Amino acid sequence: MKVIGLIPFKNEEHFLPTYLSNVKPICDEIIAVDDHSIDNSRKIMEDAGVMVKGYEDTEKLKGGWTCGLIRQHLFNYGREAGGTHFVCLDADETFTSNFVPIARDIMSQLEPGEKVRMQWLALWKSCTHFRNDYTVWSNNFKDFIVRDDTSLDYNYGYMCEGRTIGPNTDETQRTLELEHGAVLHYQFSFYNNFQLKQAWCQIGELVQKGQGAIHEINSKYSITMLEDNVGMTQMPEEWIENIPLPDIPNFDPEWNEKYFMRKNLLPDIYRHFDEYGVEYFKDLNVWHIPQLREKLNA
């Protein structure tokens, strides 16, 4: 058994130590693709012994999203390196600490094409509590680990790709009980950054799909604003012990740009504004972000 972690990243220097903390100990190797980061992401990964590959794609989607295409390359790299099992977490995720000691034993029991399906905990404006209510941000499960079957391919969609190769069915997925381990998703923990990224996604998607997609995009991303009657559950300390975290506030009411973790997002948005005009995007629900609202009202 050779376990390889596969990760695409772009400007994730703040989260990569978090990812590495509980992914590296269960992997024999990690292979990453750096999608043109302009921060210290690549150095952090290389210093940790990760094999980092660059990525060039002449058919890059004009909305600026290449993650699904990169995942295809990652599975090829993993196979070339002799991987039998692939761990597919993103940079703003890591495993709960209680999963680490049992992870390899669980993976060793998988048949070719089988996957470990784990609960995906949305840490909402917090690093110690996960969302637990009746919204789409609760009780989510996802395929994060797969034993390779070389007859399988990877499929993706624009900004909504899956993680592992092959179909997700009752026959291919083994669901891990929450008390044995889960995946911590820190995307929502640092809320200004979450909202900025969602605005970046919406604006990029409108560029990619055109004005006719306004209603579709607003409907799709309305779930990012579900703030009423939020239910939260505190995690046991043993789930999160020894996990390093970004040193920024969970929410900054002043929206100070020094706390923006991905330095490309705001410049990317401004570039679209310059190319298309701010009015092109006026019907999107992104203007709660002060920097964008200022551009609209200028």
Name each region found by the language model:
Residues 28-36, 91:
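Short beta-strand/loop segment that forms part of the nucleotide-sugar
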